[in-house]
Structures are given as C-alpha cells and as structure tokens.
Amino acid sequence: MLASTFATHPAAAAAARRRGPIRWRLPFCSQIVTVTLRRRFPMARLSITNALASQSLESAPAAPPKHSFPILVNSCTGKMGKAVAEAAVSAGLQLVPVSFSAIEVPDGKVEICDREIYIRDPSEGESILPSIAKDYPDMIVVDYTVPDAVNANAELYCKLGLPFVMGTTGGNRQLLHKTVEDANVYAVISPQMGKQVVAFLAAMEIMAEQFPGAFSGYKLEVMESHQATKLDISGTAKAVISCFQKLGVSFNLNEVKQVRDPQEQLTLVGVPEEHLSGHAFHMYHLTSPDETVSFEFQHNVCGRSIYAEGTVDAALFLHKKIQSGANKKLYDMIDVLREGNMR
C-alpha cells in the first residue's frame, strides 16, 4: 500500500504530534528474500556428468520449448530460490537440475514442480559449474543466497563468464558492480525485484533528480519490517533513503528502525500472521521543520511471488540482451521495466 498524507493546518500538525511515533496503517498485501548459502565457492575438478553419476540426470523433464533457455537457481533450498524456480518453470524455462547450498537436504535433492534438483555443496561450485555450463548452453544463473556470499559468488560467475541475475541483497555493492564491469559479463543487479515497487523507486529517482533539495530541512523517520531471517537492512529502504537524501533530507542508515520480532510485527506493524515468515513492509514519514506539513509513503508486500515473477522477467530480459549482442552488459530492474518486458 502506498499512502501519502499532506497536512498544512496547525491543528492537523498538532494531531500528528499527539500521534507519537510513526504507526503502520492496515496492510495491503500483494505478494522476500530468504537465503541459504553460507560458504563461499572454492573447488575439485569433475564434470557434471561424473559429479552426478550416482544421481542420473535422466530423470529430468523433457526439453522445454525452443524459445526457452536453461536457468540455474542458487539456492533452491531457500524459500526465495524455491519461489523463483517455480516461477521459472511456469514461464516455460528449463530449470537446471542442480543447485548449490550449504544446507543438507534428505537424499541430497529437493523436488520443485515435479523436478528433482540435486543439491551440491558451495565448495564444489568452481569445479562443477563449468561442466554444467557446457551441458546447458545459454544458461543464466539466478542468485538468492546470503549477503556474505554476494561478492564471492559474483566473482565466480564472472570468472566463468556466466550471465547472472543477482537478487541477493547486501555485500559490497560498489565492488559487485566493479567486478561485473571489469569482467564484461552480462548481469542484472537490483536490490528490489518486485516490478511495481521498482516503478515506485523509479518515480522517487525522477523526483530526486528533478527537484533536488525540495525537502531540505525535513525530518525523516523510516521503519521497515521483514521476516526474522533477513539479516541486513532492506535494500529497497536504502534506495528510497538515498532519494530523500538527494531531496535535501539529512538521514543516516543507523536511524532506520528494523522490526524483526514477530510480536512487534503483529501488533505494531500489522503484518498478517500467515505472512510473518515472508513479508516486506516499509514506511517513510517526513515532517517539515515547523511540523505543519507531513508526508507519508508506505509500501507493503506479503509473500514472495512478486519478487519471483520479477526475477524471471529479469532473466528473460537478460537472455534477450545476450542474444542481440547488446553492447551494454550491466543492467538493473529499471532497465527491465523500461524495456516493457513485464509479463
């Protein structure tokens, strides 16, 4: 839900002051990122055929339609990765039956949409990925792992020349972009994969560029709530805060109120109980220096499907760019949105 409030009368401002700290409105849910890989990707040499000899790939589904391409999801043991894998199958893409995760699973495999996905340890990544890429030409990797693995994983994908979509937040983002640019590898990197939220971010960027300093002197309060497994500050919140800073607002990231306690999420934030394990609620409240004017922006997401669908759109976009031999290699979700590739 996106809400915006504008108060100019002193009585309205007084009411706002009596209200106290920012509160969440009743949520509107549309549909975040749980993560798994805990180790980096060091190494031992074998082909995918040998590596999975005891786990024959013959059980994999028949070849997909000609317009499709292979997609490898890291990691299918996480809720976000699983959601992306399911969305990829629904879109007619060929789900590579291998994924890397430090989490042990029964029989070393998981089942997604009647497909068996064999789980390999991250330490085998450098030795196995080249064989997988050979067996699955035109493969695109999707990364939903953990913040600590972002840079190491991207470095590995770039080293092997594998195009990828980085949905994992966190890590050193400047280094991440530099790694991709230096390697000249195709990639989509975005802290936010939800298409409608990306459109909101784009609008914020336009406002910041067109009207710098418009909110100079205003006080900003930011609250974000995600499932307890999300370790870092919301990448979306960081992006919106950056826009407000360009608009003249003074704000430090350590001022963000992160809500991870389920009880607070229920009572303070208003997250539906069934979505405590997967949601993304954000509120930004601006108050003028004399407290006579206030603005409030809010966007709430329940579940993961909005991110999964956006990630698949990003992969489809990237595949199109690769096939056309586009000179530009590094993209974000705003590029995807502008292309009109949204399904």
From Swiss-Prot:
<feature type="binding site">
    <location>
        <begin position="190"/>
        <end position="193"/>
    </location>
    <ligand>
        <name>NAD(+)</name>
    </ligand>
</feature>
<feature type="active site" description="Proton donor/acceptor">
    <location>
        <position position="226"/>
    </location>
</feature>
<keyword id="KW-0520">NAD</keyword>
<dbReference type="InterPro" id="IPR011859">
    <property type="entry name" value="Dihydrodipicolinate_Rdtase_pln"/>
</dbReference>
<keyword id="KW-0150">Chloroplast</keyword>
<dbReference type="GO" id="GO:0070402">
    <property type="term" value="F:NADPH binding"/>
</dbReference>
<dbReference type="InterPro" id="IPR036291">
    <property type="entry name" value="NAD(P)-bd_dom_sf"/>
</dbReference>
<feature type="active site" description="Proton donor">
    <location>
        <position position="230"/>
    </location>
</feature>
<keyword id="KW-0521">NADP</keyword>
<dbReference type="GO" id="GO:0008839">
    <property type="term" value="F:4-hydroxy-tetrahydrodipicolinate reductase"/>
</dbReference>
<comment type="pathway">
    <text>Amino-acid biosynthesis; L-lysine biosynthesis via DAP pathway; (S)-tetrahydrodipicolinate from L-aspartate: step 4/4.</text>
</comment>
<feature type="binding site">
    <location>
        <begin position="235"/>
        <end position="236"/>
    </location>
    <ligand>
        <name>(S)-2,3,4,5-tetrahydrodipicolinate</name>
    </ligand>
</feature>
<keyword id="KW-0809">Transit peptide</keyword>
<keyword id="KW-0560">Oxidoreductase</keyword>
<protein>
    <recommendedName>
        <fullName>Probable 4-hydroxy-tetrahydrodipicolinate reductase 1, chloroplastic</fullName>
        <ecNumber>1.17.1.8</ecNumber>
    </recommendedName>
</protein>
<keyword id="KW-0934">Plastid</keyword>
<keyword id="KW-0220">Diaminopimelate biosynthesis</keyword>
<dbReference type="Pfam" id="PF05173">
    <property type="entry name" value="DapB_C"/>
</dbReference>
<feature type="transit peptide" description="Chloroplast">
    <location>
        <begin position="1"/>
        <end position="14"/>
    </location>
</feature>
<keyword id="KW-0457">Lysine biosynthesis</keyword>
<dbReference type="InterPro" id="IPR022663">
    <property type="entry name" value="DapB_C"/>
</dbReference>
<comment type="function">
    <text>Catalyzes the conversion of 4-hydroxy-tetrahydrodipicolinate (HTPA) to tetrahydrodipicolinate.</text>
</comment>
<dbReference type="InterPro" id="IPR000846">
    <property type="entry name" value="DapB_N"/>
</dbReference>
<dbReference type="GO" id="GO:0019877">
    <property type="term" value="P:diaminopimelate biosynthetic process"/>
</dbReference>
<dbReference type="GO" id="GO:0009089">
    <property type="term" value="P:lysine biosynthetic process via diaminopimelate"/>
</dbReference>
<dbReference type="InterPro" id="IPR023940">
    <property type="entry name" value="DHDPR_bac"/>
</dbReference>
<dbReference type="GO" id="GO:0009570">
    <property type="term" value="C:chloroplast stroma"/>
</dbReference>
<dbReference type="Pfam" id="PF01113">
    <property type="entry name" value="DapB_N"/>
</dbReference>
<comment type="similarity">
    <text>Belongs to the DapB family.</text>
</comment>
<feature type="binding site">
    <location>
        <begin position="167"/>
        <end position="169"/>
    </location>
    <ligand>
        <name>NAD(+)</name>
    </ligand>
</feature>
<keyword id="KW-0028">Amino-acid biosynthesis</keyword>
